[in-house]
Amino acid sequence: MKIKEIIPVALGEKTPDLLIKNVKLLNVYTGNIEKTNIAILKKRIAGIGNEYNVGKEIFNAKNLYAIPGLIDAHVHIESSMLSPIEFAKMILPNGTTTIIADPHEIANVLGVEGINYMIKATEGIPLNVYFAIPSAVPATFLETSGAILGAEDMVSLLEKYPFRLIALGEVMNYPGVLNCDRELITKIEILRHKYKKIDGHAPGLSGKQLNAYIDAFVRSDHECETKSEALEKLSKGMHIFIREGTAARNLRSLIPAVNILNHFFFSFCTDDRDPEDIYKRGHINQIVKEAIGQGLDPVIAIRMATINTAKYFNLRSMGAISPGYKSDIVLVDNLYDFNILYVIKDSKFVVKDGKIDLKIESVFKDVPTTIGKINITKNYSLKVKNRNKKIRIISIKKFSLITEESIVSPKVSKNEIISDVENDIVKIAVFDRHNASGFSIGFVKGTGIKNGAIATTIGHDSHNLAVLGTNDKDMELAIKRILEINGGIVVIKDKKVISELSLPIAGLMSDETYNTVIKKLQHLKKSIEKLGTKNDVLMNIHFLQLAVIPKLKITDKGLIDVENQKIVDLFVEV
């Protein structure tokens, strides 16, 4: 839209497309609540004031509160297991109108092809979808990825999508930064000279190492787990994204770090949320509501979900309800219960009475719904011979991506190490599903599985095929079924498939509606409970391969000592 089109509307000389009257507007700049009217032309707010009283369409808000559209500072769409359009349909009723998505899940499987898919699939939908170019493809060379995204690829992508790509995705390989890895530093230099943000990922980093990491122009972090960690990073100039995902939930521990003086440098993000979690709890709106419930001032909480994030990413016309800004507006009943009733996007109501009121589809009709193929080694054995030594195992921590290393005496039967159900220890195997180069075997504690097996092609970040279970027969059947459905999640009990969710888009996302996926996921989780465990274990399983978050992880190449970035043996000399 041209400037000369909107100025006559602001002056009252021409009629706006939409007039929202009798609204209580939260001004994120002043912190005041203003009883006023809002005049909108096309995708922009033309004017604010009680002097505006005509419009081609007039909506009486009847004293509802108007806040800016909510912004998710860091999200992986793929973690929802939904196609991008279905993901948009889920989060719009929750008031999210803008996301900064890092497509490094699909990029680690399909490379540039995967990034192209995500960008095209979100073109022309009533959701502002910006992308961070994945910095970690692969995240580490201690696993086998489906692709390598080099500096030359980044240059090509920036030339092709200069306005959709606004950052370098989370720099997970912080050892690479500290060791001045040539390829990684080159990527950072390319993006910073294009005036793009460099997003961080540095769990537990502090002191001199944190200083060195920030020296590489890394300006944000979403991995803080404690108040002291957040305040140290904030004090050194980092913008803190408070994460509240499905598996990793840091809101309660980090809200105490926020105060009236420093809150401008905090934002909210979901990072990874599955669709059932979004359906039950919500999206950024849930984080805002919970933060307010913990005593945070509503104005501060809403700033953290809107203008703070927009300012950080240089989204100059977003994050506020002001003249010339994008008409991304959310109407809520009050600032405490935070019930979202209407969402306006580009002068149109996309949500009415809390429900989608607009057909959402991409302008691209040729986006594939099935891409990628699962490919693993054909000849394998899951048996582990006893060597009369102790073994190192992965220990899961609830609601955390951080795992611990434990040294235990294994359970042995017929000279083979087997799952030790009584002590909550089960076998896990990870297969390279991209090149069929091999697999590794380990053991994990804390899943609660007492019978059966679970297999999945979701495994951050290279998303290799992982299977864990109490016995080899069920594990082998789970692998077989995963191959038949070309990726997804399979649950086995007593040598029978009791539930499955097919994910044909790169083995990560479904091509079905979000309602269908939620129903299947609910059935899947109930089936997992039949194995004796709690259903929230699934998201933990999906992060057991993440070899850039401490302490002990497993990839197709073996057990990984994350802090020292090296492969370690299953057996331990004592």
Curated annotation (Swiss-Prot):
Keyword Thylakoid in annotation: no
GO process terms (BP): adenine catabolic process
Keywords, comma-separated and alphabetical: Hydrolase, Manganese
Cofactor(s) needed for function: Mn(2+)
CDD domains documented for this protein: AdeC
EC number(s) on file: 3.5.4.2
Catalyzed chemical reaction(s): adenine + H2O + H(+) = hypoxanthine + NH4(+)
InterPro entries reported for this sequence: Adenine_deam, Adenine_deam_C, Amidohydro-rel, Metal-dep_hydrolase_composite, Metal_Hydrolase
Keyword Manganese tagged: yes
UniProt family annotation: Belongs to the metallo-dependent hydrolases superfamily. Adenine deaminase family.
HAMAP family, alphabetized: Adenine_deamin
Name assigned to this protein: Adenine deaminase
Organism encoding this protein: Thermosipho melanesiensis (strain DSM 12029 / CIP 104789 / BI429)
